[in-house]
Amino acid sequence: EIEGELAGTNTSCPYHPSHFRNQECTFCYCPFYPCEDPDLGEVAESPRLGRIWDCTHCNFIHRKDVASYVHGRLRASGISGPGDPALEELFRETKTKFHRKGKAVMILGATSDAGKSVIATAICRILNDRGYSVTPFKSQNMSLNSRVTHKGHEISMIQDLQARAAGVSRPSFRINPILMKPKGDGMSQVVLEGVPAGDYSSADYYSEFVPGPGTDALKRSIDFLQSRYDFVVMEGAGSPAEINIYDSDIANMRAAEAADADCILVVNVEW
């Protein structure tokens, strides 16, 4: 890989896209693995290998500017193998130069069914087609339609569809950290970060869950996604102006504030 030229996007590879559709494929394996940088990965448990460094959702070395810079610096420095101590210094240098927080945009709706999901999906596809790494995000979704990720976590079906539009080959629970599944009689099962967390009434959800685990999960997911993607396309829920839950609404403006997102309001002209 060091001796060859920049590979570009190798669509003929049977594993493409391993990260996002327009990824730079020069480095099939990251020369910095395991970097153990919390901005780019996390420790995970492997059934076969025990504790490993998991960077499934790290796109850093597959960005064209990063791959080009690292390729040139590896050649110039004479680094030829993974054990070279100069790799650690090159990693720090590269991260300082290129790592940046992803830009967030929030799609809000004047009402439910205004078209937020369709607009968010379209923006994901447009940004992906332009060569950016992009991910969808919806902090809180109420739906009985869900999908299971490759790691066994449950997320809403629409976020899974948006991930496909964004070119994300392996979506994680981070794109939908809170999934509410209505059970009737005012109760919902809450799936937190892909795992069932209990049944809540509407009152208990907003008074007990949202201020603690709900807000914490929202911030963890936003930090995770913004550290790994160029763009985070966020989708709100219902209307951002429901005054009865405004102070405890983590699906709309509070999520937008946490991500410092620009907001687009979708309005159904029939209303």
What are these regions (language model features)?
Residues 1-97:
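Cysteine-centered metal-binding/redox modules
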Residues 93-271:
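Flexible phosphate-sensing "switch/lid" loops adjacent to ATP/NTP-binding sites
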